[in-house]
């Protein structure tokens, strides 16, 4: 898999500076769902950060955008990898009201925000490039979407 790359940003500087690069074992996630790509800024918890992101892989209905979750420590070491796509609701599946922005895209679930809300976690995301959604997951549901990377 591609390494986790951390960047440092200091206002009002608009340049992102490399802060570290960390290799990790994705246990075959990339081979099935594609490499992890962009997503929401990391959200802190008691001893690290959660990062909701996405990957893209070919499917019979077109390229499918899968939401995923990983966790890393403040020093950048990835401690938990996705054990599959993050199960976010999509009642529309591949149906759209408008023409596709990307003619090759099938189902698109694109995470854009992650925030703690009491004991739960709120995840904002886009569906098929035309709808926005909000899912609230409990801490156990979040933890079930990842597996610990052996030390």
Language model: regions and residue ranges:
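Beta-rich carbohydrate-recognition and catalytic domains
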Residues: 1-34, 44-104, 120, 125-151
């Amino acid at each position: 898999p591609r390494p986790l790359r951390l960047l440092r940003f200091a206002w009002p500087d608009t340049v992102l500076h490399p802060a570290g690069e960390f290799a990790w074992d994705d246990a075959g996630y990339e081979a099935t769902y594609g490499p992890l790509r962009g997503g929401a800024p990391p959200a802190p918890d008691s001893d690290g950060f959660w990062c909701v992101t996405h990957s893209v892989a070919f499917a019979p209905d077109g390229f499918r955008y899968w939401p995923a979750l990983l966790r890393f420590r403040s020093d950048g070491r990835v401690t938990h990898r996705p054990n599959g796509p993050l199960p976010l609701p999509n009642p529309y599946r591949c149906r759209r009201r408008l023409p596709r922005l990307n003619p090759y895209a099938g189902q698109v679930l694109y995470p854009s925000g992650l925030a703690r809300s009491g004991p739960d976690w709120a995840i904002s995301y886009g569906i098929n490039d035309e709808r926005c959604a909000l899912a609230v997951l409990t801490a156990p549901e979040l933890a079930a979407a990842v597996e610990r990377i052996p030390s």
